[in-house]
Amino acid sequence: MLYFLLHLYNRQFEIYVSSVGLVRELPSIKNQVSQSRIRVFPLLREPMRKKNRKGDWRMNAKKVIIDCDPGIDDVLALLLALRSPELDVLGITVVCGNVPTTQGAENALKVLALLERLDVPVYLGETKPLVRPYVDATDTHGADGLGESFLPNVTQVRPKECAIEFLAQTLSEQKGVSIIALGPLTNIARLIQDYPACLEGLGELVTMGGSYKSHGNCSPVAEYNYWCDPDAAKVVYEAFESYPTLRQKQIHMIGLDVTREIVLTPNLVEYMTCLSEEMGNFIRNITRFYFDFHWKQEGVIGCVINDPLAVAYCIDHSLCKGFSAYTTVETAGISLGQTVVDAHDFWKKEKNSHILTETDPYRFMTFFITHIFGADASDVRYVLRQIMVEDAGKRVWMPKDEEDYVEMLKGDVVK
């Protein structure tokens, strides 16, 4: 027996069924609804399938520490990281950024509690930038950093002190651990200044920050994370050019050039809620504020989610393309926080960074939904095509009449 969730949205019915196969059998449904079009969405076959966190999965997983300033997109990135069997999250270090450090730590614990992963430790890091005054981003993320959802704090465990010491000890004891930095680079700069020897064992540094050709999001030229603490960003980039232990490595810069391509829309949130009511409602509650901000500031229907792309890239480098170059960060004047990328090698300096400039939103969103919700990839791809997520620069074709609609049901049609 078929179960349908049917609702009216802008004079258009959307029908959710249990699998793509059933969609193929439903061309006659359109005749039952006059003066409207139908879009058909397959539901998850195994709602909210939990990853098995027992056994030897950690042996093959990439060991990472996530350094973040948990606002809305950081939390989505944490969801992705903690639901990905490819990653073994050794700990979460918190830095001041979107919200003050203590609030960011509370938000990280809320995610861990939601996923029943309070075994992952949370550490308090720096509470102010290296030099300049601290300016938060609560205008973007809400007073609590989670869209003013004001979820209750976690009481079972509390954040630990000394994020820098945790980073140093972990990198010294376990070779090949990577850092995914989703906030200002203050903690990472302090680590470099205080414990440079531990960096020899660093795996990768993937940072969400900066931009190459894209405009800024807090000034005409600067992205917030690097603008919040430009001195720290400069320390980190210069270290990868000058420190002997880091000169053979590069910073992977996931900047606004690629993250602006990743837009979470109301349709996608609705679909996620169908996959898991609990997780979907959590995402809906924390992103409402974000939706309003993006509409008022940039005319975007939905919200740009920067940080999850950095996590996805750390798992699968093929999700983004780019080039290697020397990069530095401006620390004064009207271009404060700007990443200066020497793409044409004018300065003949060591290429200290890998600048990502291209991504595929369709592939990313498939990755995001399948990992967080345990959804079947073929079903997710079918849904994304119907709700017009861009696929490598092409917009998915939507039917204009009955004949086109039947053709769509026969297969995935892209024109």
Stretches found by the model and what they are:
Residues 60-68, 72-110, 144, 150-259:
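Active-site histidine-anchored catalytic micro-motif
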Residues 40-58:
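Short, Lys/Arg-enriched N-terminal segments with co-localized hydrophobic residues
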Residues 62-64, 105-173, 352-359, 364, ...:
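Metal-dependent C-N hydrolase catalytic cores
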Residues 4-11, 32:
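Short hydrophobic targeting helices and cationic amphipathic motifs
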Residues 14-17:
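Short hydrophobic alpha-helical segments enriched in small aliphatic residues
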Residues 22-23:
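Intrinsic, low-complexity polybasic segments
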Residues 57-62, 79-84, 88, 227-231, ...:
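Conformational coupling and interaction surfaces
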Residues 122, 236, 311:
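A residue-level signal for conserved active-site and pocket-lining positions in enzyme catalytic cores
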